[in-house]
């Protein structure tokens, strides 16, 4: 049985100020664009698009654009600093297991995305055109020269490698809004000699803007709070934005379902109310899950968004999985594991936006409403 009702969120002001920021800035046909702060570096004013703390919700055009006055400066090693930075990675292929290994070694000379002149970079790694397997490095805070040394494996038959392209996209992590792309690199695998381990360092290119090609599903904002004394986790679904259009009229009737899992075992499930004809629903509905202290690091929560259909089965839009990084579940992003970790150390609600993801192929199933 679905649990019904919603518990009023508290404290309300703190959460609303995060998920529902006051829009201040320049009005445009698409809404409001923030007024970026400027830093004078002697050759002109460079806009610094900061989102910590956030006062507006960023648009797709709000990317950091480094200024090049025609003379690229030198790094400490004497190498030219590229305007989007550089990335160092390693590629090798295991012919016996048909596995492609990609090691993200480091990045350097990345653009500064935060007010303090630093960034919180991480790298997404995937292979085109399928995008079935996506990996992320850990987030390294307050640096423009992160070192990762993290390896990811893709199952690809050797005779298919020539038709694949390796994509590396560097992001700046932001807890209170959508993460910003800093730079990207596409590597056609047909150009790689897989007879040896290939060590590559290349400049990053200008990142592509989010568009229909990226099949964005939308974003969701929720808060989490853990009370060890009572063994309860309170999850408050605040709102969602820019959801995928599921209905003929170009809208959706979204609602949110929350599943509590221990491994593959379903322990509890709850859902929000439905919101009709909107791609930006507001909920502010809270749910409590009873979790014993010895189980808190063994369970995970799946927050999924669905489109309600009266005449047919409901359609899945997207989901995020929240849990400890020690579970080693590939669907738990670094943003989700960081929110979980902060929830475990803070006694206040932890609020964060997340980008909705596709379900992994083996986990796809129909709605059971």
Curated annotation (Swiss-Prot):
Q: Per its Swiss-Prot or TrEMBL entry, what cofactor is needed?
A: Ca(2+)
Q: What happens when the gene is disrupted?
A: Defecation abnormalities.
Domain annotation C2: ranges: 83-204, 216-354
Positions contributing to Ca(2+) 6 binding: 309, 312-313, 315
Which GO BP terms apply?
A: calcium-dependent activation of synaptic vesicle fusion; regulation of calcium ion-dependent exocytosis; regulation of synaptic vesicle exocytosis; vesicle-mediated transport
Positions annotated to bind Ca(2+) 2: 114, 172, 174, 180
Read off the PROSITE patterns from this record. Answer: C2
| Record keyword Iron-sulfur present | no
Q: Name one GO cellular component term.
A: exocytic vesicle
GO MF annotation: an example = metal ion binding
Q: Which InterPro entries match?
A: C2_dom (IPR000008), C2_domain_sf (IPR035892), Synaptotagmin (IPR001565)
Q: In which tissues is it expressed?
A: Expressed throughout the intestine and in several neurons in the head and tail.
Q: Entry's Pfam families?
A: C2 (PF00168)
Q: How is the cofactor bound?
A: Binds 3 Ca(2+) ions per C2 domain.
Instruction: State the source organism's domain of life.
Output: Eukaryota
Amino-acid biosynthesis as a keyword of this entry, yes or no, is no
Subcellular location per the Swiss-Prot or TrEMBL entry: Cytoplasmic vesicle
Q: Record-annotated residues binding Ca(2+) 5?
A: 247, 307, 309, 315
Question: Which amino acids does the record list as binding Ca(2+) 1?
Answer: 114, 120, 172, 174
Give me the residues that bind Ca(2+) 3, please: 174, 177-178, 180
Task: Report the family membership.
Answer: Belongs to the synaptotagmin family.
The name under which this protein is listed is: Synaptotagmin 2
